[in-house]
Amino acid sequence: MLRLTRRTTLAALIALGTAAAAMPGTVRAADPVKLEIGYIPILAASPLFIVDGQGWAKDAGITLKLTRFESGPHAIQAMAAGQIDLLYAGVAPVLVARTKGADISVIANSAVEEMVVAARGPFAKAVGTTPTAESFKKFAADTGRKPKIGTQPPGSVPDTVLKHWLFKVVKVDPTDVELVPMGIEKTQQALLAGALDAATIREPTVTVTQQMDPNVALLATGAQMFPDQPGTVVAARAEVLKKNPEAIKALVKAHIRAVELIAKDPAGSAKIVNNYLGKGLMEPATLEAAFKGPGSKFVADPHKVVPAVEQMMAFTKEIGSASETIPVAEAFDFSFYDAAVK
C-alpha cells in the first residue's frame, strides 16, 4: 500500500501542474498586453482617459501607458519611429504620414467639428460676428499690422481647417494675415496675454478662455470652418494591429463605451477626465461645460468621417501640406470597429 506523506503529495501536485502546463490546449492566464498610447491634451481624447480611469483596459488584460504630445505632427513622428503604439490625434497628420510611407491606420473616430476660431481685443471688435476679407484688410490698415492668428504646426488639423476657413470661406488674402504655429498650451496663454489676436482652439480651452475672459468671442464654429470637420481619430501602427488583434478589438470596444458614457453622463465623465486634462487643478464643472459646448461632438464610427476626410486630404495637397494624396479608405482599417459593434 502506497503511503502519501505531505512531501510526496506536494511533489505529486507540482508534477501534475507541470504536466498540465505542458499539455497543448491548456488554458493559462495570459500576460497583459502592454500598449503605449500617445495623445494630444484636448477634450477629444476623453474616451482614452475614461477607458484608463475606469479600468476597462485593465479588465480586458491590457496595460496602458499614456504619453502626452503638444501637437499631432510631433506625435506622428514618434509613432512612425515606433516609440508609441496607438495615438489619439487629428486625422490630417495621420494621412500625411501615410503619404510618406508610414504604415499607420485609423481604427476608430473620436470627435468631429471640434476646432473653433476665437478672438479677443481690438481684432474681435473689428471683424465682428461675421468676418469678411474686407474686415481683415481694414484692421491691418487701421492698426498698421496684420492680425496674428495662432494655430498648430503645418499639416495639423488646426492649421488645415484654419486655412480652409480663411482662404476658402472668408476668402482672406494670405498677405493680410499672419499665422503663428505653436503648441496647444502656448496658444491659450498667448491669446489671453494679448500676444495673439485670434487662435484655433479646442475644448476645454474654449471654455477655459471664455471663463477667464468673457470678451473672448467665437468667430467661427467647427462646422463653419470646414463642414463635417474631421477631427480626432484613434490610429495604430500596422505591426501592433497584427500582433495584438484581440487586444485592439477590446480597446476599440472600450472606446465606444466611453463615447456613449460621455453622451449619457457628462458630469460623471468630467470628473474622470479632470484627473488627466485638469491635473486636479481645473473644476470638473468646467469640463462638464466643455462637454456641452459647441466644440464637443463625439463620434466613434470611423465610417461616418470618410467623405469629409477625403475633402480635407485634397485640401492638404492644395495648400502644400501633403505632396500627394492617397485613397483615404486605405488609411482606415474598419475591421476592429465593425467587430466591436457586433
Regions found by a protein language model. Name each.
Residues A30-I42, I62-R68, K146-T151, E178-V180:
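Short, well-ordered beta-strand elements
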Residues D31, A97-I107, F167, V208-A223, ...:
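Ligand-binding "clamshell"
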Residues P41-R68, P73-H74, T160-K168, T209, ...:
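Short, polar/charged alpha-helical segment
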Residues P47-D52, T67-S105, M115-A119, K138, ...:
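Pocket-flanking alpha-helical
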Residues I50-D52, V116-A126, P230-E246:
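A bilobed periplasmic-binding-protein/Venus flytrap-type ligand-binding module shared by bacterial periplasmic
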Residues D103, S110-V180, E185, A238:
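A conserved helix-loop-strand patch within extracytoplasmic ligand-binding domains
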Residues K186-Y276:
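Pocket-lining segment of extracytoplasmic ligand-binding domains
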Residues K242-S323:
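Secondary-structure end/capping motifs
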